[in-house]
Amino acid sequence: PMDIEWAKDGITGDLFIVQARPETVHANSSASEIMRYTMSAELINDLRRSGKLLATGQAVGKRIGTGRVRMYESYDEVIRRKRAVQKRLAEGELEEDLLLDERVFEQGDVLVTEMTTPDWEPLMKKSGLIITRKGGRTSHAAIIAREFGIPAIVGCTGAMRVLEPLMEVTGSCAEGDE
Protein backbone atom coordinates (compact mmCIF):
# COMPACT_ATOMS: atom_id res chain seq x y z
CA PRO A 1 0.00 0.00 0.00
CA MET A 2 1.07 3.57 -0.73
CA ASP A 3 0.31 7.05 0.58
CA ILE A 4 -0.15 9.12 -2.57
CA GLU A 5 -0.57 12.89 -2.58
CA TRP A 6 -1.95 14.42 -5.73
CA ALA A 7 -3.02 17.77 -7.08
CA LYS A 8 -5.63 18.69 -9.67
CA ASP A 9 -5.01 21.54 -12.12
CA GLY A 10 -7.90 23.96 -11.63
CA ILE A 11 -7.92 24.98 -15.29
CA THR A 12 -7.25 21.80 -17.27
CA GLY A 13 -8.50 19.25 -14.76
CA ASP A 14 -5.26 17.24 -15.13
CA LEU A 15 -4.17 15.19 -12.10
CA PHE A 16 -0.57 15.21 -10.92
CA ILE A 17 1.10 12.96 -8.36
CA VAL A 18 3.15 15.26 -6.14
CA GLN A 19 4.41 12.66 -3.65
CA ALA A 20 4.23 8.89 -3.28
CA ARG A 21 5.70 6.82 -0.47
CA PRO A 22 5.07 3.44 1.13
CA GLU A 23 2.29 3.64 3.68
CA THR A 24 3.64 4.05 7.20
CA VAL A 25 2.82 1.80 10.14
CA HIS A 26 -0.88 1.34 9.32
CA ALA A 27 -0.34 -1.26 6.59
CA ASN A 28 2.37 -3.02 8.54
CA SER A 29 0.35 -3.41 11.74
CA SER A 30 -1.41 -6.63 12.50
CA ALA A 31 -5.05 -6.65 11.46
CA SER A 32 -5.79 -8.85 14.45
CA GLU A 33 -4.50 -6.33 17.01
CA ILE A 34 -7.25 -5.55 19.50
CA MET A 35 -7.16 -2.63 21.90
CA ARG A 36 -9.19 -3.19 25.03
CA TYR A 37 -10.51 -0.26 27.08
CA THR A 38 -12.01 -0.69 30.52
CA MET A 39 -14.08 1.88 32.40
CA SER A 40 -15.74 1.53 35.73
CA ALA A 41 -19.55 1.41 35.78
CA GLU A 42 -19.48 4.64 37.80
CA LEU A 43 -17.45 6.45 35.12
CA ILE A 44 -19.68 5.14 32.34
CA ASN A 45 -22.77 6.38 34.18
CA ASP A 46 -21.14 9.77 34.81
CA LEU A 47 -20.31 10.10 31.11
CA ARG A 48 -23.84 9.17 30.11
CA ARG A 49 -25.25 11.80 32.47
CA SER A 50 -22.84 14.65 31.87
CA GLY A 51 -20.74 13.86 28.82
CA LYS A 52 -21.34 15.82 25.69
CA LEU A 53 -20.04 15.84 22.15
CA LEU A 54 -17.96 18.99 21.66
CA ALA A 55 -16.80 18.59 18.05
CA THR A 56 -16.36 15.97 15.33
CA GLY A 57 -13.88 15.27 12.55
CA GLN A 58 -12.24 12.34 10.80
CA ALA A 59 -10.89 9.70 13.18
CA VAL A 60 -7.36 8.43 12.60
CA GLY A 61 -6.49 5.15 14.27
CA LYS A 62 -8.58 2.99 16.58
CA ARG A 63 -7.60 4.32 19.98
CA ILE A 64 -9.04 6.65 22.60
CA GLY A 65 -7.01 9.62 23.82
CA THR A 66 -7.56 11.83 26.82
CA GLY A 67 -5.71 14.70 28.45
CA ARG A 68 -5.42 18.44 28.98
CA VAL A 69 -5.94 20.67 25.95
CA ARG A 70 -2.90 22.60 24.76
CA MET A 71 -4.03 24.88 21.95
CA TYR A 72 -1.70 26.61 19.49
CA GLU A 73 -2.53 28.82 16.50
CA SER A 74 0.86 28.12 14.88
CA TYR A 75 4.22 26.51 15.59
CA ASP A 76 5.69 29.99 16.14
CA GLU A 77 3.37 30.25 19.14
CA VAL A 78 4.86 27.02 20.55
CA ILE A 79 8.34 28.54 20.33
CA ARG A 80 7.24 31.87 21.88
CA ARG A 81 5.54 30.14 24.83
CA LYS A 82 8.49 27.83 25.43
CA ARG A 83 10.92 30.79 25.49
CA ALA A 84 8.66 32.75 27.86
CA VAL A 85 8.56 29.87 30.34
CA GLN A 86 12.33 29.29 30.06
CA LYS A 87 12.94 33.00 30.74
CA ARG A 88 10.64 33.01 33.79
CA LEU A 89 12.34 29.86 35.13
CA ALA A 90 15.79 31.40 34.64
CA GLU A 91 14.69 34.57 36.43
CA GLY A 92 13.26 32.55 39.31
CA GLU A 93 9.69 33.66 38.63
CA LEU A 94 8.45 30.09 38.16
CA GLU A 95 9.09 27.06 40.30
CA GLU A 96 10.07 23.94 38.36
CA ASP A 97 7.05 22.10 39.80
CA LEU A 98 4.61 24.85 38.78
CA LEU A 99 4.86 24.09 35.09
CA LEU A 100 1.17 23.24 34.85
CA ASP A 101 1.05 26.68 33.25
CA GLU A 102 -0.79 26.58 29.93
CA ARG A 103 2.43 27.41 28.09
CA VAL A 104 4.07 24.05 28.75
CA PHE A 105 3.29 20.91 26.75
CA GLU A 106 3.61 17.74 28.80
CA GLN A 107 3.55 14.03 27.95
CA GLY A 108 -0.04 12.92 27.28
CA ASP A 109 -1.45 16.41 26.66
CA VAL A 110 -3.92 16.95 23.81
CA LEU A 111 -2.43 18.93 20.92
CA VAL A 112 -5.04 21.19 19.30
CA THR A 113 -4.01 23.29 16.31
CA GLU A 114 -4.94 24.45 12.83
CA MET A 115 -2.71 21.89 11.06
CA THR A 116 0.74 20.35 11.51
CA THR A 117 4.04 20.34 9.62
CA PRO A 118 7.26 18.42 10.36
CA ASP A 119 8.19 21.10 12.94
CA TRP A 120 5.36 19.82 15.16
CA GLU A 121 6.69 16.25 15.45
CA PRO A 122 8.40 16.62 18.88
CA LEU A 123 5.06 17.74 20.39
CA MET A 124 3.09 15.17 18.41
CA LYS A 125 5.22 12.33 19.81
CA LYS A 126 4.32 13.44 23.36
CA SER A 127 0.60 13.83 22.63
CA GLY A 128 -2.12 11.64 24.07
CA LEU A 129 -4.42 12.88 21.29
CA ILE A 130 -3.98 15.16 18.28
CA ILE A 131 -6.81 17.39 17.04
CA THR A 132 -6.48 19.59 13.94
CA ARG A 133 -8.96 22.00 12.42
CA LYS A 134 -7.76 21.26 8.89
CA GLY A 135 -6.67 18.05 7.23
CA GLY A 136 -7.83 14.66 6.10
CA ARG A 137 -6.62 11.06 6.12
CA THR A 138 -3.51 11.89 4.08
CA SER A 139 -2.60 15.07 5.99
CA HIS A 140 0.67 15.35 7.87
CA ALA A 141 -1.11 15.03 11.23
CA ALA A 142 -2.89 11.83 10.13
CA ILE A 143 0.26 10.21 8.75
CA ILE A 144 2.35 10.96 11.85
CA ALA A 145 -0.47 9.90 14.19
CA ARG A 146 -0.70 6.53 12.41
CA GLU A 147 3.07 6.15 12.47
CA PHE A 148 3.28 6.70 16.24
CA GLY A 149 0.00 5.00 17.17
CA ILE A 150 -1.50 8.21 18.55
CA PRO A 151 -5.24 8.78 18.15
CA ALA A 152 -6.03 11.85 16.05
CA ILE A 153 -9.10 13.73 14.91
CA VAL A 154 -8.42 15.75 11.76
CA GLY A 155 -10.70 18.16 9.94
CA CYS A 156 -12.30 18.98 13.28
CA THR A 157 -13.52 22.43 12.28
CA GLY A 158 -15.15 23.37 15.58
CA ALA A 159 -12.30 22.32 17.87
CA MET A 160 -10.52 25.65 18.24
CA ARG A 161 -13.80 27.40 18.91
CA VAL A 162 -15.22 25.09 21.59
CA LEU A 163 -12.14 23.71 23.36
CA GLU A 164 -10.30 25.76 25.97
CA PRO A 165 -6.70 25.57 27.23
CA LEU A 166 -6.25 23.06 30.08
CA MET A 167 -9.75 21.61 29.55
CA GLU A 168 -9.79 17.83 30.15
CA VAL A 169 -11.11 16.11 27.01
CA THR A 170 -11.47 12.62 25.59
CA GLY A 171 -11.34 11.86 21.88
CA SER A 172 -12.45 8.48 20.59
CA CYS A 173 -11.24 7.04 17.32
CA ALA A 174 -12.50 3.59 18.35
CA GLU A 175 -16.08 4.11 17.20
CA GLY A 176 -15.70 4.62 13.47
CA ASP A 177 -14.53 7.14 10.91
CA GLU A 178 -16.11 10.24 12.45
Residue ranges: model-predicted function:
Residues 54-57:
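Hydrophobic cores of alpha-helical transmembrane segments in multi-pass integral membrane proteins
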Residues 1-50:
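ATP-dependent carboxylate activation and anion-phosphoryl transfer catalytic cores
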